[in-house]
Amino acid sequence: MKTLGEFIVEKQHDFSHATGELTALLSAIKLGAKIIHRDINKAGLVDILGTSGVSNVQGEVQMKLDLYANEKLKAALKARGEVAGIASEEEDEIVIFDGERAENAKYVVLMDPLDGSSNIDVNVSVGTIFSIYRRITPVGIPVTEEDFLQPGSAQVAAGYVVYGSSTMLVYTTGYGVHAFTYDPSLGVFCLSHEKVRFPATGNMYSINEGNYIKFPRGVKKYIKYCQEQDEATQRPYTSRYIGSLVADFHRNLLKGGIYIYPSTASHPQGKLRLLYECNPMAFLAEQAGGKASDGKNRILDITPVKLHQRAPFFVGTKSMVEDAERFIAENPDE
């Protein structure tokens, strides 16, 4: 059975002028994921559950595990020396790594260290999301915010780790999507799903229907469409919503479906972060034959203007995302 490390080295030839930095960078993320996996599994036995009492730049109270995962991933990436700096959902500003090696590094990493962390207390799946870009500024100097404010189409690699009944790392470098399952007895990620593709059709929709009254008119119409009886299109669809983007996306990737987090009356710009959540998942979706949109525009075409920018998010089976876009276009809010 092929391990993640073996697979990454084998695929290194996909990159022109590859010299091993990206391979080492992905290995650092793999190490961070293994550490987080270990500690999530005993979270109820040590004091890393619950809130930290600290708020992030968006005014949201951070969970203890959010901060813990952020520090572990940051340390793993810094130790490898292949990263010039990071941006994280848990950090107010970019983190610039110091030292000559970091200044000469080609890549920057953006991450959501622990997506869905509020689910930890009740033992529901959570995940880590990461996104890798080649820096814009010249090597040899510290990175700037400009290196992180790139459209998603410029991503070199992206992926996530889902910590569930098993721990899985799923990633793409622009040559398909591959998934690796963690074997705790050996301490390695083993290739379990190669060239993952969204099914051509799906019958699941994932959305927090508790916010229905706040949704745009087109989204309400689409939800009703999902719930209507129609044998020709195999409706009604099944509603499945975990409340963890990674877990919901992962299920829909394997089974077929759409994940929706639209703009609402209370969050007119959307709730999910463009850089840390939408872009990496959009890259994965497109590489797996799916689609990702803000309801009108391709997610990967959006040029961000700030680190913690938000966006409405529609991602999943291509035909389902296109149906949702059609309902939004045909039913504008007055």
Swiss-Prot record:
Subcellular location: Cytoplasm
Residues binding Mg(2+) 1: E89, D112, L114
GO CC, any one term: cytosol
SUPFAM superfamilies: Carbohydrate phosphatase (SSF56655)
Pathway(s) the chain acts in: Carbohydrate biosynthesis; gluconeogenesis
Residues that, per the record, bind Mg(2+) 2: D112, D115, E277
Binding positions (substrate): D115, G116, S117, S118, N208, Y241, K271
A molecular-function term among this protein's GO annotations: fructose 1,6-bisphosphate 1-phosphatase activity
One of the protein's GO biological processes: fructose 1,6-bisphosphate metabolic process
Cofactor binding: number and manner: Binds 2 magnesium ions per subunit.
Main location as per UniProt: cytoplasm
S-S bridge residues: none
UniProt-listed InterPro entries: FBPase_C_dom, FBPase_class-1, FBPase_N, FBPtase, Fructose_bisphosphatase_AS
Family: Belongs to the FBPase class 1 family.
NCBIfam families linked to this entry: PRK09293.1-1
Subunit structure: Homotetramer.
Protein name, UniProt field: Fructose-1,6-bisphosphatase class 1
Organism, as annotated: Serratia proteamaculans (strain 568)
Species lineage: Bacteria, Pseudomonadati, Pseudomonadota, Gammaproteobacteria, Enterobacterales
